[in-house]
Regions:
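Short glycine/proline/serine/threonine-rich loop/turn segments at secondary-structure transition edges
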Residues: 97-101, 140-145, 216, 257-272
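Exposed aromatic-hydrophobic patches
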Residues: 131-138, 248-256
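Short, solvent-exposed loop/linker segments at the N-terminal edge
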Residues: 190-201
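Substrate-binding/catalytic cleft of secreted carbohydrate-active enzymes
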Residues: 338-343, 348-468
Length: 468
């Protein structure tokens, strides 16, 4: 069964890079850095590494905000110097999860992060804003103490505003059965066959089921839909799902729901989906997802309609930093900020200019805000398309999300053929991952030339964004 542990307490922190990464490493007498020479050779991430002089910290943690202001640091980044930093943590696996698969989920590290466990490379992640998960099962010792080390390099900027540095969002350790729903593994789509009749909605459910074991499994997948706080399901359905060893299978189900309670700004009602995976009488996984039922559309002449009613979007560009804590934002801070915005008449948020913390979207779902969810950079490299895909697959179940933003003021490409083709490919990918929401691109400068360039190169953006 799935068990989730908050992995935020008891970390060690060192500011600055380390010239030597050896500790009881092979070839340590000949090289200062031998982590790429032998498996398990990364000393900083091994148990026993001397970190007594490192600082004790809890996550989320922004190490840049603790710096002294200096005129030599970049002013638009707060006149605070950035750096490379290291984090370390030792941990033991509780007895009840020692024979399960072990995953580490990171909501955000700024930036260019490399993660090591017990001397072994676990993974790397370039973006300072997208979330990711690592399966570290084989790297963990089920019976002994384990160690993790994270190196991040905040010296490169992604924005022209304060970005901080470090493991500045939540981290979780998640234990699962070999047979489980992977990270961001469900997709829930609500469509109305008749936009004029909101009493009947068609819901499409998809769950990815991954079998990390060495044997084929004859699974049973059950979808249960609840009102958010309800104890009894309003809908339930089961189906057989044979999953071959070492593979993932998408389980799809479609249902009609009558008289749904709609999600709206004034009444943000949520539903809860439980995806149950079992084999014979053994429960292998229960994966929780929240979603809302609502219709939203944009009309060039009449504007935005939510659940068939015309609304005005009264929004703000929401940069994630806050006084005193930098980018290490707790949900309580974002909740306070949203309450102030709600009192001012605000009903929409733009995640300027990057993927947000997951908790911000949870709050917008529950507090009744619409969200323009923005990827960090326009591009068609595997890295930038991967960032866009990670954003959409993580966030597409949130009813608050109403627009996918493909970029912001990309002055070098927005008026030429290359840019139109790049944005077209990004929009095509977005439509495949989520055909229920429109895309937007936030243009600046000469809107007429930009629009003409799009049309001349065969690109039709779903919603045209004009900044200034």
């Amino acid at each position: 069964m799935r068990t989730t542990f908050q992995f935020t307490d008891g970390w060690k922190f060192h500011r600055g890079d380390l010239d030597e990464t050896n500790y009881r490493a092979i070839h340590a007498n000949r090289f200062k850095r031998a982590e790429w020479m032998k498996a398990g050779n990364h000393g900083i991430s091994r148990v026993g590494y001397p970190d007594e002089t490192w600082h004790d910290v809890d996550l989320p943690h922004d190490f840049v905000v603790a710096s002294d202001y200096t005129p030599t640091a970049n002013a638009v980044h707060g006149s605070l110097p950035t750096d490379v930093a290291w984090y370390r943590k030792t941990f033991e696996l509780p007895a009840e999860i020692r024979h399960q698969r072990i995953h580490l989920e990171f909501d955000g590290i700024y930036r260019d992060a490399t993660i090591w466990v017990n001397g072994h490379l676990a993974g790397s992640h370039l973006s300072g804003y997208t979330s990711f998960s690592l399966d570290v099962t084989e790297l963990c010792d089920p019976n002994e103490c384990n160690a993790i080390a994270v190196r991040c390099d905040a010296q490169e900027f992604e924005l022209w505003s304060y970005e901080g540095g470090g493991i500045y969002r939540d981290v979780r350790l998640v234990a699962t059965d070999d047979l489980h729903v992977p990270y961001s593994g469900t997709c829930i789509r609500s469509t109305f066959p008749d936009e004029a009749d909101l009493s009947k909605v068609q819901i499409e459910l998809q769950a990815q089921i991954h079998n990390a074991g060495r044997e084929d499994r004859a699974a049973q997948v059950t979808f249960k839909i609840f009102a958010d706080t309800g104890a009894s399901p309003v809908y339930e359905s089961s189906q057989a799902a044979p999953i071959a060893a070492g593979t993932s299978t998408a389980i799809n189900h479609r249902l009609d729901l009558s008289q749904p309670t709609l999600w709206s700004i004034a009444s943000p009602h949520l539903y809860r989906l439980e995806t149950h995976v079992q084999v014979a009488d053994k429960s292998c996984d229960i994966y929780h997802s929240h979603f809302g039922v609502r219709s939203i559309r944009f009309d060039a002449d009449q504007g935005c309609f939510l659940n068939g009613e015309s609304i005005k979007l009264k929004g703000v560009c929401n940069h994630q930093d806050h006084a005193g804590v930098g980018v290490a934002i707790l949900p309580t801070i974002d909740e306070w900020r949203l309450k102030q915005l709600k009192a001012m008449g605000c009903n929409a948020i733009r995640t300027a200019h990057n993927p947000p913390a997951p908790h911000l979207l949870d709050l917008c779902d529950r507090m009744g805000f619409l969200v323009m969810n923005e990827t960090r950079l326009s591009g068609t490299s595997p890295e930038f398309l991967g960032q866009l895909q990670a954003l959409i697959t993580r966030d597409r179940n949130h009813p608050s999300v109403c627009l996918w933003s493909l970029g912001n003021e990309e002055m070098l490409i927005q008026e030429n053929a290359m840019g139109a083709k790049m944005l077209q490919r990004m929009q095509d990918l977005t439509h495949r991952l989520d055909p229920t929401r429109p895309c937007i691109y936030s243009a600046n400068c000469d809107f007429n030339n930009i629009a003409e360039n799009f049309v001349n190169n065969g690109f039709q953006i779903d919603t045209f964004g004009a900044n200034y």
